[in-house]
């Protein structure tokens, strides 16, 4: 049986651009793409923490080191520059593969600097 698990995410990324007339996609700093284990043209889910919007698009590369998170095309209507978003990618795998799988989690600060990377999320306290 195949199950779907979180593969990688950028947590609390700040939207730096919203380009309505650019080809639809999400441009992400190439360094962030590598840290989160994402790929160019990979499908991603975007969760807008500021307005609750949730939508799908795909990754395109932005200049490495630029800290760019740009929502393009129709996705630009779902955000405002400055919004904080979670960008997530998922992967299907067997249960046996899932037993040893670890996601790549990248936490960003308010300026899109990497705060930390990890492969676990602490248990939520009651």
From Swiss-Prot:
Main location: cytoplasm
Cofactors: pyruvate
Binding of substrate, residues: 57, 73-75
Manner of cofactor binding, per the entry note: Binds 1 pyruvoyl group covalently per subunit.
Keyword RNA-binding (UniProt): no
Free-text description of this protein's post-translational modifications in UniProt: Is synthesized initially as an inactive proenzyme, which is activated by self-cleavage at a specific serine bond to produce a beta-subunit with a hydroxyl group at its C-terminus and an alpha-subunit with a pyruvoyl group at its N-terminus.
Active site residues per record: 25, 58
Pathway: Cofactor biosynthesis; (R)-pantothenate biosynthesis; beta-alanine from L-aspartate: step 1/1
Entry annotated with the keyword tRNA processing: no
UniProt keyword terms in alphabetical order: Autocatalytic cleavage, Cytoplasm, Decarboxylase, Lyase, Pantothenate biosynthesis, Pyruvate, Schiff base, Zymogen
Top-rank taxon, per record: Bacteria
Gene Ontology CC entries for this record: cytosol
GO biological process: alanine biosynthetic process; pantothenate biosynthetic process
Quaternary assembly: Heterooctamer of four alpha and four beta subunits.
Annotated family: Belongs to the PanD family.
HAMAP family from the UniProt entry: PanD
Official protein name in the record: Aspartate 1-decarboxylase
């Amino acid at each position: 049986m195949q199950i779907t698990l979180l593969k990688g995410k950028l947590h609390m990324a700040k939207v730096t651009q919203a380009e309505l007339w650019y080809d639809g996609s999400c441009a992400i700093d190439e360094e962030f793409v590598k840290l989160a284990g994402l790929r160019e043209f990979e499908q991603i889910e975007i969760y807008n923490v500021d307005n609750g919007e949730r939508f799908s698009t795909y990754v395109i590369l932005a200049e490495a080191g630029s800290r760019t998170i740009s929502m393009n095309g129709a996705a630009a209507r779902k955000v405002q520059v400055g919004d904080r978003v979670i960008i997530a990618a998922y992967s299907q795998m067997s249960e046996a593969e899932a037993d040893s799988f670890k996601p790549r989690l990248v936490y960003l600060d308010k300026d899109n600097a990497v705060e930390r990377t990890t492969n676990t999320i602490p248990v939520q306290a009651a």
